[in-house]
């Protein structure tokens, strides 16, 4: 506490006129404080400290509850973390199996549908010989089966030619069939019947005809009638 009316000289019994004349002598000083006044009584503060401790514990309780919730969430996250790798592994296995099936369908299964000696190309079974023949050509033309068929050499003849004798007989029979008339058909029918009976159309037997014309029977043409 500050006590007024004190001076350096330590003489409190001066008059007011002397205080106005000597300003330095009237400067107040801070008196020393008693230590007992600075220390409060502990009897009332015990309850306050107890209440303060109780309030601090009550303030810490939500944090503890929050920690419990965090632990529960951490436990649940750990369980989910254990489940997620299993689901990912199953999904990865399914995707891998699908890729294997697609590759099997595209590479091997389609080739089994074509017979031996054929190869599936552009969803069409093409002969292996044709495929080998056109592998040396331009890949642009090789991609199209129609272009390959169009470029196939036409000089090759896929079949045996008919012999000349049989071809001539076939042509003659065809021409006779086209140019036959009812009368010619009747004559040819009678000649066929006579040949079956062993006689000529005139009614004579073949033996009688040979006796009358021995030269004709020997294969020498007879003289024409005059």
Curated annotation (Swiss-Prot):
Low complexity composition-biased segments: 183-196
Membrane spanning residue stretches: 89-109
Segments on the Extracellular face: 1-88
Pfam families: Calcyon
Keyword field: Cell membrane, Cytoplasmic vesicle, Endocytosis, Membrane, Transmembrane, Transmembrane helix
Mutant lacking the gene: phenotype: Mice display impaired clathrin assembly and clathrin-mediated endocytosis. Transgenic mice with up-regulated forebrain expression of Caly display a range of abnormal behaviors including spontaneous hyperactivity, reduced anxiety and/or impaired harm avoidance.
The UniProt record lists the keyword Membrane: yes
GO molecular function terms noted in the UniProt entry: clathrin light chain binding
Protein location: Cytoplasmic vesicle membrane; Cell membrane
This protein's GO CC annotations: cytoplasmic vesicle; cytoplasmic vesicle membrane; glutamatergic synapse; plasma membrane; postsynaptic endocytic zone
Broad class of the protein's primary localization: membrane
Cystine residue pairs: none
Highest taxon listed in the record's lineage: Eukaryota
InterPro entries: NSG (IPR009431)
Spans annotated as Disordered: 1-21, 177-226
Biased composition range(s): Basic and acidic residues: 206-216
Function according to Swiss-Prot or TrEMBL: Interacts with clathrin light chain A and stimulates clathrin self-assembly and clathrin-mediated endocytosis.
Protein's name according to its UniProt entry: Neuron-specific vesicular protein calcyon
Taxonomic source organism: Mus musculus (Mouse)
